[in-house]
Amino acid sequence: MFFVPACSFKNEIDSNYYCQKLKLTCTKGNKIIYFKTSKGDFEVKLLGKDYPVTVSNFLENINNNIYKNKKFYKIINYPQIKFIHGGVNPENEFYIEQNQTLNKTSASIPLEIKFKEEIKPRYNYQIKNPNETKNLVNTFESGSIAMVKSGKNKSSSTEFFFVTSKIPELDGRYSIFGKII
């Protein structure tokens, strides 16, 4: 009989696999993008170094003008939860039309989260123990941008949201891929 004093997650799939599968040019560095809105302009730092698949997908959407002249179509302003939902509503005719012309093989991308002390992000990993969120590289705080979920371990390929306050209940459940700067 023997005892295992510690155990770690073996992360064999890397971002190149998903970038090839989704036909994305994989971004490995951080990028700054600009949002111009009727309520004011702001910059967002995209964390391509830590979340290459999600950032690559988002940049492809920008390059394909999928967000151009679109509205933030849902604003949630409850006392404990505040967020702004943007992107293209997948039930919208425009999305269905555009998705067919984009270089997309799927309407979803893998859930992508990264833990401290790990080199690569984890894909489609579901956090089961709340204590695991303490080791996440990024958590939801005011200004975080993340992809909406389209299934248990999948993120939408076009819908995103910003949070306007700290929301620890969402940590590890969505792909946070940037922050307003």
Language-model-derived ranges and their functions:
Residues 5-181:
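Cross-family detector of peptidyl-prolyl cis-trans isomerase
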Residues 1-3:
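Bacterial N-terminal signal peptides
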